């Protein structure tokens, strides 16, 4: 909260995404944004935008929120980074359910349902990128941990709709808790957003350089 009110997620994440785009482009990395204004795009439509542009990575920025049933929920804060896989804990399931419900509620539409064959093919495509997604999540979490004023909540996994149709290494970053006053102030500040953008951009560059070296080594005659 800032000045006693909960911040709208898009008011935080859109400026972050634009700053991140600028930092990535400084590092020679081209960026495709799924949206540049506070418009609603169904979760299942975002991955295909990246697929159509043959993107190498998919990064989704979000703000977390405490469960209203938690005691002292407003004190919960910190950063966590997710990749797509089966949730292992109740908290991972909670975050995935929260994110999966947001756009469906706001747009009054259901997440697109595919036929069984499409589901199987999608699962195969995601499994191919599971290790790469986990590696990217580790790098991003490590960089953000160094600048975030709250605790590191670690790298986690869950079934996020926004990641399911991105056929490439993909992560979702819960940058902080909008329900925590300190996290919200930091995420809403120019300095905080700059730290977030620089940290993620540095992690993405490190990831791309690592996998480029690994690919060159693998194909060396």
Which stretches of residues belong to each language-model region?
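Catalytic-core regions of hydrolytic enzymes
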Residues: 1-114, 127-138, 194, 198, ...
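Short, basic/glycine-rich phosphate-binding loops at helix/coil junctions
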Residues: 116-120
């Amino acid at each position: 909260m800032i000045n006693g009110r909960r911040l709208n997620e898009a008011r935080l994440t859109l400026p972050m995404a634009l700053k991140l785009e600028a930092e990535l482009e400084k590092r020679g990395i081209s960026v495709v944004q799924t949206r540049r204004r506070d418009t609603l795009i169904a979760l299942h439509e975002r991955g295909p935008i990246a697929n159509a542009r043959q993107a190498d990575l998919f990064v989704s920025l979000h703000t977390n929120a405490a469960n209203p049933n938690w005691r002292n929920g407003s004190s919960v804060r910190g950063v966590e980074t997710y990749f797509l896989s089966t949730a292992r804990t109740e908290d991972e399931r909670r975050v995935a359910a929260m994110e999966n419900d947001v756009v469906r509620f706001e747009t009054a539409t259901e997440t697109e349902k595919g036929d069984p064959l499409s589901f199987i093919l999608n699962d195969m495509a995601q499994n191919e990128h599971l290790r790469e997604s986990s590696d990217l999540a580790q790098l991003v979490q490590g960089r953000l941990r160094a600048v975030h004023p709250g605790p590191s909540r670690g790298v986690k996994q869950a079934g996020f709709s926004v990641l399911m149709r991105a056929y490439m290494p993909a992560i979702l970053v819960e940058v902080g808790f909008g329900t925590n006053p300190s996290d919200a102030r930091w995420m809403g500040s120019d300095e905080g957003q700059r730290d977030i953008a620089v940290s993620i951009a540095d992690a993405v560059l490190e990831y791309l350089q690592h996998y480029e070296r690994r690919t060159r080594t693998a194909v060396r005659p």
